[in-house]
């Protein structure tokens, strides 16, 4: 193995609820030349911890952990479980809080709807919260979001929602996470609003905060170039 290959960064990308690797299509294209990219398996596991532990079992050495939404919970858990292995932490369109009881009930209602044979109706119902108003007018973008949800399917949707409901509040862990970190959020994100990103950034010791104008929850798809640039900057900091 050449010295260059031996020193290549590893980049772990964790998708969000109802999302596949296509969530990071543009970032994979932009960054694959400088990092070995691994996509977290979020299917069929009933806890965020199980998703994170599988990553630690399957990947050797140090890596930069990036997650969007539910994937952010996985990235945070990786940093908490194995801080010595996480060279950089990227938290996109996510938060460090546990679900409130009201949010858990909303998730239970969506699970119930999906089990009544109405799974195809779940994602269109969520679209106004996943994309900005401008993003909702982009037919190609909407088609990609719907295709990801169909690929995930009802059973995995249920297990992912259960994992999200069971996650821990990680805000108390943030001040101990000393690795270079990035917190990024769209200013039009109603699922994980910018205030939550600002709180996380204020608690992380070595954090860059980026808020993107006119962007909703699925920031990596709505603002691919800006997100790729932010991740490239995080890789630079992690490699320094």
Regions found by a protein language model. Give the residues of each.
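Gly/Ala-rich beta-loop-alpha elbow adjacent to hydrolase catalytic centers
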Residues: 67-71, 75
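Short beta-strand/loop motif that positions the catalytic acidic residue
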Residues: 177, 183-185, 189
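Catalytic histidine-centered segment of alpha/beta-hydrolase-like enzymes
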Residues: 215-228
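Conserved alpha/beta-hydrolase catalytic His-Asp/Glu region
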Residues: 99-102, 117-176
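Catalytic histidine neighborhood in serine/cysteine hydrolases
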Residues: 194, 198-217
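Acidic beta-to-alpha connecting loop that harbors the catalytic carboxylate
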Residues: 16-17, 187-189, 214-216
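Conserved HGGG/HGGXW glycine-rich cap/lid loop of the alpha/beta-hydrolase fold
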Residues: 2-54, 68
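Flexible "cap/lid" loop of the alpha/beta hydrolase fold
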Residues: 48, 80-81, 85-124, 129
């Amino acid at each position: 193995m050449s010295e260059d290959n031996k020193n290549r960064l590893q980049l772990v990308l964790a998708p969000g609820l109802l999302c596949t690797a296509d969530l990071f299509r543009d970032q994979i294209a932009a960054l694959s030349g400088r990092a070995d990219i691994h996509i977290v398996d979020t299917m069929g596991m009933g806890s965020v911890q199980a998703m994170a532990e599988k990553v630690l079992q399957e990947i050797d050495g140090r890596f930069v952990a990036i997650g969007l939404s539910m994937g952010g919970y996985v990235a945070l858990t990786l940093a908490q479980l194995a801080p010595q292995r996480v060279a950089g932490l990227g938290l996109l369109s996510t938060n460090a809080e546990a679900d409130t009881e009201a949010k858990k009930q909303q998730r239970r209602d969506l699970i119930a709807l999906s089990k009544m044979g109405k799974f195809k109706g779940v994602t269109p119902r969520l679209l106004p919260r996943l994309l900005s108003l401008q993003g909702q007018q982009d037919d190609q973008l909407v088609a990609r979001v719907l295709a990801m949800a169909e690929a995930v399917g009802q059973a995995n949707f249920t297990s992912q929602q259960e994992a999200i409901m069971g996650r821990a509040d990680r805000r108390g862990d943030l001040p101990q996470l000393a690795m270079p970190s990035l917190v990024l959020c769209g200013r039009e994100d109603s699922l994980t609003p910018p205030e939550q990103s600002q709180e996380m950034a204020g608690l992380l010791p070595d954090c860059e905060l980026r808020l993107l104008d006119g962007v909703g929850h699925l920031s990596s798809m709505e603002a691919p170039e800006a997100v790729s640039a932010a991740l490239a900057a995080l890789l630079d900091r992690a490699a320094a």
